[in-house]
């Protein structure tokens, strides 16, 4: 559970770090959105270093959680209800994440 929570916090940091510049560019938000966006991306990079395995495996497993957080963001922030296809995609990516992240350590 601790691993999944760390992946989720990492994903939120990345989504926020990408969303704020997107808002600035796409919706004409303040240029000051770039400051917390950059800080959030720096936090994201630092959080990735806290995962206790090889970088490539961390990135692969993290990708599944990122998809889940992005779809949650779609629903909570963008106010767009996810489709059944979105839910199925999240389920498959989380299954892949679990296979990678929780494999037996030898």
Curated annotation (Swiss-Prot):
A Pfam family hit: UPF0060
Keyword Repressor carried by entry: no
Entry's transmembrane regions: 2-22, 30-50, 58-78, 82-102
Keyword entries, A-Z: Cell inner membrane, Cell membrane, Membrane, Transmembrane, Transmembrane helix
Membrane topology qualifier: Multi-pass membrane protein
GO cellular component terms attached to this protein's record: plasma membrane
Keyword hit for Membrane: yes
Compartments where located: Cell inner membrane
Family: Belongs to the UPF0060 family.
NCBIfam families, per the entry: PRK02237.1
Protein name, per record: UPF0060 membrane protein Bphyt_4776
Species this protein is from: Paraburkholderia phytofirmans (strain DSM 17436 / LMG 22146 / PsJN)
């Amino acid at each position: 559970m601790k691993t999944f929570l760390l992946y989720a916090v990492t994903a939120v940091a990345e989504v926020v770090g990408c969303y704020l510049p997107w808002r600035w560019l796409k919706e004409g938000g303040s240029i000051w959105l770039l400051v917390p966006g950059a800080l959030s991306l720096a936090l994201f990079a630092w959080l990735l270093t806290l995962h206790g395995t090889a970088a490539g495996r961390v990135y692969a497993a993290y990708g599944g959680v990122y998809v889940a957080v992005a779809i949650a963001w779609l629903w909570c922030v963008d106010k767009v209800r996810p489709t059944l296809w979105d839910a199925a995609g999240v389920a498959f990516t989380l299954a892949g994440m679990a296979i990678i992240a929780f494999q037996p350590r030898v």
